[in-house]
Amino acid sequence: MARHGCKADSDHLPVTLEGKLRSGVYTLPGNVSSQFITGLLFALPLLEGESEIRLTTKIESKGYIDMTLKTLKTFGITVTETESGWSIPGGQKYHGPRMRYAEGDWSNAAFWLVAGAIGGSIGCQGLDMESPQGDRAIAALLEEFGAETKVALNQITATHKEMKGIRIDASQIPDLVPILCVAAAAAEGKTEIYNAGRLRMKESDRLAVMAECMQKIGVEVEEKPDSIIITGGCNPPEGEIVIDSHNDHRIVMAMAIAAVSLGVELTILGAEAVNKSYPSFFIELAKLGGVTNVL
C-alpha cells in the first residue's frame, strides 16, 4: 500500500490510513489470504489509471476469488485474467440490478451437513449446487467419507452411513478444516488433511487449536507444520472438558457440532465469536435438539 500512495499506522489499534490509493502494478503472494486479492479487485477499477495484480505464488482459496470476479461482472466491472493475475482498467463505475439474489453460505451449511453425516439426517436449503464457492466441496467430501448426500432443487441432505478416513487437500477449502476434523473423528481409520499450513494465519492458529480440541475430547491426533492427521474414535476423559475457542467462530461451531454429534459435554469459552459469521447458530442448534446453556 505504501508503494501506491497509502501510509498506514498499523502498530496498534485503531489503524490509521492516510493518502490516496494510486493505480499501478500490485505484486503479492496468492497463498496467504484471498481477501487481499479480492479487496484490490473491488477497489482498483475505481482508480484513474489501469492497474495489474501479479501473483508470485499459486492461488489458494481460488473459489473466493471466482465469487468476486462473478460479482464484479454482474455489476458491470471489467477484469481481464492474465498469465500471472489480472488486468483492471481504471475509471470504471459500479452498475447493478436493483435486486440481487444472495445465495446460501456453503461454509456455514457444512457444520449441519457434517452433523447429519455423523448421526442422523439434516437438510440445508437455499444452496446453489453450481456455486463458485469452494466450500461446496463439502458435499463431495462427505460422499468420499462414506456418508450419503441427496440433492433436490436447492436443498442438500446429508444422512449418516458408516464413514472411513480419507485424505483431504485443504489448499482451496481452508475454512472447512475445523468441521472436517470433527467428521474425521467420527470416521473409522486415519484422515489426513494436508496443504493446510495457511490455517495458522486465520483468526487463530486453527491447526494447533483443532489438534488441542481433538486431544481434549479423547481423539488421537498428530499435528504437523502443514497438515493434521486424525484417527477416528472418541474416548473423552472423565470430568469437565473446557475448550478455548481463541475467539474463533469456526472453532466454536465445529466443537459445538462435535459435542452434540459425538456425545461429549463441553464448555466452550468465547462462544460469542459465532456473531462474526452466524449469530443464530446456537438458535438453529437448539431447533435440532442440541442442548446449550449460556454461562
List the predicted regions and their residue ranges.
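Short, structured segments at the rim of ligand-binding sites
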Residues: 1-295
